[in-house]
């Protein structure tokens, strides 16, 4: 079952500077997709379009049956927001509230109940328990990233989008995140994250979508025998 369908999407910042051109991509429910591309390929631009940050686009995409296109009504935009959650590489958070209050606040925006018990359990897994009542302004970059990731894992939006999600995380936290990410997908969620780390995508993703020359050139199912490095450099033409 498809959770996200991107059809013929072109994106620009100025009309004479097209970043993406006629992009097509389909994400299935319950899978992890890695979005790969060299620096400047347009990974963040595509994510910003899917999350509503950038509205200079043509074509359309459909998320959970809700069709999005340029100039869509505010009601449609609001509906889309409740079906996705976005974690940026350098999160912008309300710094003068506590981590727990932030997670609770985001739940209220999504009109979902906040479970202190589930939050406490997840915080323990991330070795974050002693920070839950600290102001976000007092947290390191890595711990701020944990707040964003825990929020997404608890919300269970149908689509969880991440842009370089490992920034600031230690090795143990990365392993915890990927374990929880798998549980998220087993429960029916879909994850799309951009990365320039081939080894990370190879290990943790079900599919890799390679963005090059303004388009998704190839979507590769990842298995034990997949040589993602070879596949990637065959597409971009050099190593």
Curated annotation (Swiss-Prot):
N-terminal signal peptide: none
UniProt induction comment: Transcription is highly induced by oxygen limitation and is under dual and independent control of Spo0A-AbrB and ResDE.
Effect of residue 82 to I: In strain: ATCC 6633
Keyword Translocase: no
Biological process according to GO: bacteriocin immunity; bacteriocin transport; protein transport
Origin superkingdom: Bacteria
Lineage start: Bacteria, Bacillati, Bacillota, Bacilli, Bacillales
UniProt-recorded Gene Ontology molecular function terms: ATP binding; ATP hydrolysis activity
SUPFAM superfamilies for the chain: P-loop containing nucleoside triphosphate hydrolases
Organism: Bacillus subtilis (strain 168)
Family, as annotated: Belongs to the ABC transporter superfamily.
UniProt-reported outcome of changing residue 57 to Y: In strain: ATCC 6633
Effect annotated for changing residue 117 to R: In strain: ATCC 6633
Record-annotated ABC transporter domain positions: 4-238
Name of the protein: Putative ABC transporter ATP-binding protein AlbC
Binding site residues for ATP: 37-44
């Amino acid at each position: 079952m498809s959770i996200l369908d991107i059809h013929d999407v072109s994106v620009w910042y100025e009309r004479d500077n097209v970043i993406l051109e006629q992009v097509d991509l389909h994400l299935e429910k319950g899978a992890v997709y890695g979005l790969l591309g060299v620096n400047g390929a347009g990974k963040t631009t595509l994510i910003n379009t899917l999350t509503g940050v950038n509205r200079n686009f043509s074509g359309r995409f459909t998320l959970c049956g809700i069709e999005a296109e340029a100039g869509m009504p505010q009601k449609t935009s609001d509906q889309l927001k409740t079906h996705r959650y976005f974690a940026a590489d350098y999160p912008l958070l309300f710094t003068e509230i506590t981590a727990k209050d932030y997670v609770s606040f985001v739940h209220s925006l999504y009109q979902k109940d906040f479970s202190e018990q589930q939050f406490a359990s997840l915080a323990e897994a991330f070795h974050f328990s002693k920070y839950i009542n600290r102001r976000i302004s007092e947290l390191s970059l890595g711990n701020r990233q944990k707040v964003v990731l825990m929020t997404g894992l608890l919300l269970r939006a149908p689509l969880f989008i991440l842009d370089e999600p490992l920034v600031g995380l230690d090795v143990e936290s990365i392993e915890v995140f990927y374990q929880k990410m798998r549980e998220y997908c087993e429960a029916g969620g879909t994850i799309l994250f951009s990365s320039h780390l081939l080894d990370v995508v190879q290990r943790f993703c079900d599919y890799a979508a390679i963005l090059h020359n303004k388009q998704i050139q190839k979507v590769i199912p990842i298995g034990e025998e997949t040589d993602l490095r070879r596949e990637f450099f065959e597409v971009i033409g050099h190593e």
